Amino acid sequence: MPSDRAATPKPSYKRILLKLSGEALMGDGKYGISPKTLSAIAGDVKDCVDLGVEVALTIGGGNIFRGVSGATEGMDRSSADYMGMLATVINAMALQDALEKIGVNTRVQSAIEMHQVAEPYIRRRAIRHLEKGRVVIFAAGTGNPYFTTDTAASLRAMEIHADVLLKATKVDGVYTDDPKKNPAATKFKQLSYIDVLKKNLKVMDSTAISLCMDNDLPIIVFDSTLRGNVRRVVLGEQIGTTVGRLEEK
């Protein structure tokens, strides 16, 4: 009789970094955190953990405060960015709570030290948590102003030796144009890093893309609003758009 272990699908990746936007936590709201959406995201993460995948996350803070927007309104850019970093800590703590409620051991590591609520970011400790099966949520971006949480995600993914960076969005990949505004827009199945930069495609900011390109870290852009999509990507299903170093023919 085959064992349950034998029936478990084999994931394509051992260690992943999942990048979530702050807006992903809002659900249908216009601000803040939707408990229902938070629970759904936690469930998707648990599905990956149950497959034996080591999961790290980086979360934005745009559902609470966006540094660039604050700077546009006349606020000092550094101050605005630090406020945005603090917003990511709130989101990280919320997701940690949602994960631990469903039995997933989780640690939050903040690039800005605040010992009462999170561990400081220590690369070796983060890797050790992952090896022990804990989920690690990286908060406060890089800890420096002028750097996006996309860049922080790329940096952390490389530091922990992630196999892939999963960029969660509200659309099912990268398109030639905004599919919500232009019905004729077509989706890319694959893109090279250079194509993303040359065509100025809104995958991630250019610093984040360049970091991934320089270190051969593949990026998969996919729709995270559909329950189970994170698991599908981890199992190697061809959904979304893959950004990488395409082989020349």
Curated annotation (Swiss-Prot):
Activity-regulation annotation: Inhibited by UTP.
Q: Which Gene3D superfamilies match?
A: Acetylglutamate kinase-like
Pathway it works in? Pyrimidine metabolism; CTP biosynthesis via de novo pathway; UDP from UMP (UMPK route): step 1/1
Sorted keywords for this record are: ATP-binding, Cytoplasm, Kinase, Nucleotide-binding, Pyrimidine biosynthesis, Transferase
Report the subcellular localization.
Answer: Cytoplasm
Tell me which residues bind ATP.
Answer: K19, L20, S21, G22, G62, R66, T169, Y175, D178
A GO biological-process term: 'de novo' CTP biosynthetic process
Pfam families, per the entry:
AA_kinase
Give the family from UniProt.
Belongs to the UMP kinase family.
Q: What does this protein do?
A: Catalyzes the reversible phosphorylation of UMP to UDP.
Q: What is this protein called?
A: Uridylate kinase
Organism, scientific name:
Anaeromyxobacter sp. (strain Fw109-5)
